Amino acid sequence: MKFFFIFFIFLFSFLIQSCYSDNTILRSQSLKDGDVIYSEGKRFAFGFFSLGNSKLRYVGIWYAQVSEQTIVWVANRDHPINDTSGLIKFSTRGNLCVYASGNGTEPIWSTDVIDMIQEPALVAKLSDLGNLVLLDPVTGKSFWESFNHPTNTLLPFMKFGFTRQSGVDRIMTSWRSPGDPGSGNITYRIERRGFPQMMMYKGLTLWWRTGSWTGQRWSGVPEMTNKFIFNISFVNNPDEVSITYGVLDASVTTRMVLNETGTLQRFRWNGRDKKWIGFWSAPEDKCDIYNHCGFNGYCDSTSTEKFECSCLPGYEPKTPRDWFLRDASDGCTRIKADSICNGKEGFAKLKRVKIPNTSAVNVDMNITLKECEQRCLKNCSCVAYASAYHESQDGAKGCLTWHGNMLDTRTYLSSGQDFYLRVDKSELARWNGNGASGKKRLVLILISLIAVVMLLLISFHCYLRKRRQRTQSNRLRKAPSSFAPSSFDLEDSFILEELEDKSRSRELPLFELSTIATATNNFAFQNKLGAGGFGPVYKGVLQNGMEIAVKRLSKSSGQGMEEFKNEVKLISKLQHRNLVRILGCCVEFEEKMLVYEYLPNKSLDYFIFHEEQRAELDWPKRMGIIRGIGRGILYLHQDSRLRIIHRDLKASNVLLDNEMIPKIADFGLARIFGGNQIEGSTNRVVGTYGYMSPEYAMDGQFSIKSDVYSFGVLILEIITGKRNSAFYEESLNLVKHIWDRWENGEAIEIIDKLMGEETYDEGEVMKCLHIGLLCVQENSSDRPDMSSVVFMLGHNAIDLPSPKHPAFTAGRRRNTKTGGSSDNWPSGETSSTINDVTLTDVQGR
């Protein structure tokens, strides 16, 4: 019996010493390497860890519910332990310490607070916020906490800044490298001097600053908001200057990291994809780099000029030669003027500005902006002023005045604040439009001009309305009875006018409805070539014997009107051998139609997805089709008068003439870009599953690389004779199937055998397959542009880069036996098809 009692006491003591499933370390306990304590909700863990393949051991805090190792705080960051003999325990004086071994007497890290021998109940507790706290569990009094000693990570509800009375200054310091948490040379802190702002340093060099606090946000962080994710609390009083970011939704896991390259980044954890997603970073551009344009200069990243730097009003380049060479580091100096401080100067108002460095400003929070102006005007050394809190809940308040050089000023398209710069009377006249009276005259002139223009527009509108009524009346009399209108949309009349203008300029012929009806035998069923979400397509024969294809907008189509207008605008301007040729259009009553050249061989999908027709396409024909499609896309992206992204490239939108020359068709979803624009975004994602690039399907981001992705899918379909949207063996789609075979060195096995092995060179086919995989890489920046693709297709003696992991965009489940498709769409999406066109309305998240 005595033996069992002793054994029970021993076991109980062992459990007390070794079991750390709770969130607390008692003063009598220790934590050895391998032991971990968790916060109450199991969100965070505290213990020993290593990074990557390193054997060095550190003590720190990390996310417990995140699959990717993410360290948020490191105790012994500059003193790692070489093996697993480390120990965490309380010292005799009550500090929590880390020892390199269980026998060590001198700690390598300590909380290093006041002597706490008189605190026998002291514990270390890990909270669900990720904060390790030394406290008295009875009174709740805190003696030390890790939140007051951040490393490279700022967590929600972590107070950041300084407290004068306690001497606590919370400073973030980067790691040395991703695999070394030692103290790096990048620091981030709240500036103690002048008016509060956040500063990032590279060593001793100021690298970036947030701008001053406006009452709602930092003036140099226009993306900052407290409405959706964060509840931001800013404190500025004689004892404390701090900021705290609280999350409004506890389910959102987010952190801000200062990395070793000098970038501050904010991440959120994507539980679905199991990875961190970055959604903000700074510095963002050249204008964010501290004092990029020198003293008294300002930076405008949206400037249409070649140089983003300019001098503030009333200033000129200090070294004109350097400015000509695009070097503004010497800054600007005031233009010599006689009227400064003689009562004849004033203030130029600069809007949407990140105001200059506030480290040396004079601050008075008890006067209005108008009083601030008068104070600055009376002080000859005052060069500028601004409101301290211009976005305060109580309205603009406080006064900031600058005396001397102004550093690190920039402008924004939106956000920023007003900044008032002292200038002499001549500069003020130029800035304000020849003075106040000149400004009033300018306003009167503008009002008069607007009134005249409005009168002309109203008169012109009345004229057009009468002309439309006459045109409508004439056409009603001529219309066949089978097309009598039930209504006439005002929008249709505007389209008709635009098309009539194109017809008169011979840019796009306009067909009469009666002509189209006769050519198609009143849209007889036997002349119907196909149908889609836009509406049916009919074959017709004009009186001169020319065969045509008529695309007729269905009255029930919910998507067709916008696509119809888009296609009319685009295709009438495009001319290329590999683009379908439009012959004209027709808009009468409720009828809207496009008239194309007739292509007897139908579309590409008719050949490559049907066994009998596929056998007609040997390798030379398939290679010719691939190259032709590539040249057509290159023309859209680069060589046409407009830069166009098709957005719906697929096999059914490639038509074949009698010589099997491919013609890209269906420009209803295309987008026109400016000459230098290469990407855009939309909330209305349209296209076809299986052909849509991942960044477009998931985020609405489209670019020339979106078409490259679709072209890559086409290449793979042409080579294999299989649809991308079908399931193959265990693969999600064709791209995944090909990638698996490519990785295993079995890609040659998926080439379509119906081509006939004698018609193709294995090396050439594999090169095309290689190019197809380069086009469907997941990251759009990794994909080649179309000029590179066309070059690679036309040259054999070149080395191709190895393709990276492709994107596997989910498509509809197909019946691989029949080639048909089921209705297994992702839930919550609505779709309609023009030969499988898919439209998805993406709601903001």
UniProtKB/Swiss-Prot annotation:
Residue ranges constituting the Bulb-type lectin domain according to the UniProt record: 22-147
Reaction(s) this enzyme catalyzes, per UniProt: L-seryl-[protein] + ATP = O-phospho-L-seryl-[protein] + ADP + H(+); L-threonyl-[protein] + ATP = O-phospho-L-threonyl-[protein] + ADP + H(+)
Major location category of this protein: membrane
BP terms from Gene Ontology: recognition of pollen
Annotated Protein kinase domain residues: 523-808
Signal peptide: 1-21
Keyword Disulfide bond: yes
Sequence similarity: Belongs to the protein kinase superfamily. Ser/Thr protein kinase family.
Topological domain ranges for the Extracellular compartment: 22-441
Region (CaM-binding): 612-629
Keywords in alphabetical order: ATP-binding, Cell membrane, Disulfide bond, EGF-like domain, Glycoprotein, Kinase, Lectin, Membrane, Nucleotide-binding, Receptor, Serine/threonine-protein kinase, Signal, Transferase, Transmembrane, Transmembrane helix
Protein's recorded name: G-type lectin S-receptor-like serine/threonine-protein kinase At1g11410
Membrane-spanning intervals of the chain: 442-462
One protein family per Pfam: B_lectin
Annotated localization: Cell membrane
Species whose genome carries this gene: Arabidopsis thaliana
Positions annotated as active site in the UniProt record: D648 (proton acceptor)
Superkingdom of this protein's organism: Eukaryota
Binding-site residues, ATP: L529, G530, A531, G532, G533, F534, G535, P536, V537, K551
Residue intervals of the PAN domain: 341-424
List of glycosylated residues: N82, N103, N185, N231, N259, N357, N366, N379
